[in-house]
Amino acid sequence: MNKTTSKRLLALDILRGITIAGMIMVNNPGSWSYVYAPLGHAQWNGLTPTDLVFPFFMFIMGISTYISLRKYNFEFSHSAALKILKRTIVIFAIGLGLAWFSMFCRTWNSLSAEEISFFSRLGQSIWTFDHIRILGVMQRLALCYGATAIVALTMKHKHIPYLIATLLIGYFILLITGNGFEYNSTNILSVVDRAVLGEAHMYKDNGIDPEGLLSTIPAIAHVLIGFCVGKLLMEVKDINEKLGRLFLIGTILTFLGFLLSYGCPINKKIWSPTFAIVTCGLGSSFLALLIWIIDVKGYKSWSRFFESFGVNPLFIYVMAGVLAVLLGNIRVPFDGTTTSLHSYIYKGILQPLLGDYPGSLAFALLFVALNWSIGYICLLYTSPSPRDKRQSR
């Protein structure tokens, strides 16, 4: 790997790390009743800083998919397809596992007051598949990765932009004709999810599952845009030309998305076409900014914190999910009764010391720091030593 490529990948790791840290922070406030406006999602139409973190990660996944598939020369083979399928299934299964683990812990706690045997309680807690959420963040990542990888190996890359446009335009037509911009159960997205998945297996938000089946269509287009940006990153050698193209793509996509939002609202929960376009544009511009800071100016000492998140992003995200479930379900004595460890830390320590909103933010930051410390330890043990680096040259 040449020097330019190495630096370019460092900037990508940092952006990935920033998004993972952001996802962990906004998903784990001390109290959902006390969240600063920029750290909350838009209720329906609109865009907040928090709405950027997940689509940024999807965008980065598209770039990484291009990089990882180069070893196959983008030619379809049974071995490549098998590896893609295996990775897709594993990521999807991990997402289901997280959903099951959360349901197991909640069910176990809800049965604590009932006079039933240990094994009966255990059995009821384990068997929660009749109302487990099927889709989610990890599942969306899996489906979009699998679809993008197969497209990359079976379609000429010069045709991918046309596929992206077809997916986004087709999805917009679906939204227009299917009441898709309404925030209720008459929305075509809700209708399809209830018919295919069943209401018991959906996220509860006015009938809308933000990671539902139909909204996976524009999400695939989203990752494909990242794939095309990855192609640019790896093929353009001159750093100034690379930055110029990234900023140009980012500016055009952002301007186009906001312009089209007058007829197609920007909406994360339905992953509207304009949401995909705008967030990919902002992601491209942000990546260009990081490359300029890290590669051109050489300011990279600050990035070590985010590198810990960016090198093993899925591991950190899953670990954060498990820790969040444990904090929310481990019971401890508090004020004459019992409460979750999460609630105890916030209500018993941070809220009295700092207040409602600052205490809630402090909890989120401390949780990020906890996950960073684990990620940093993993980075230390997985990074090659200076001696190993010398021997590999």
PLM regions and their residue ranges:
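Long hydrophobic alpha-helical segments that form multi-pass transmembrane helix bundles
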Residues: 157-221
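Transmembrane alpha-helical segments and their boundary/interface "anchor" motifs
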Residues: 51-54, 71-99, 103-148, 152-171, ...
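Membrane-interface transmembrane-helix boundary segments in multi-pass integral membrane proteins
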Residues: 47, 209-219, 268-279, 284, ...
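Conserved small/polar residues in nucleotide/adenosyl-binding loops
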Residues: 381-388
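N-terminal signal-anchor module of multipass membrane proteins
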Residues: 2-73
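Functional transmembrane helices that form membrane-embedded active or gating regions
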Residues: 5-14, 19, 243-255, 273, ...
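Specific transmembrane alpha-helix
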Residues: 54-70, 141-150, 214-235, 253-259, ...
